[in-house]
Amino acid sequence: IPCGESCVWIPCISGMFGCSCKDKVCYS
């Protein structure tokens, strides 16, 4: 599920909610 956040230059801020970077977009 996309978290509505990109992770091209910075890590996923939403990572604290279980999201991770995949193909430059944060997914949960």
From Swiss-Prot:
Disulfide bonds join 3-19, 7-21, 12-26. Expressed in fruit, pedicel and stem but not in leaf and root (at protein level). GO terms for biological process: defense response to Gram-positive bacterium; killing of cells of another organism. Keywords: Antibiotic, Antimicrobial, Cytolysis, Disulfide bond, Hemolysis, Knottin, Oxidation, Plant defense. It holds the Pfam family Cyclotide. The keyword Disulfide bond applies. Chassatide C11: Probably participates in a plant defense mechanism. Active against E.coli ATCC 25922 (MIC=8.5 uM) but not against S.aureus ATCC 12600 or S.epidermidis ATCC 14990. Has cytotoxic and hemolytic activity. Belongs to the cyclotide family. Bracelet subfamily. This is Chassatide C11. It comes from Chassalia chartacea.
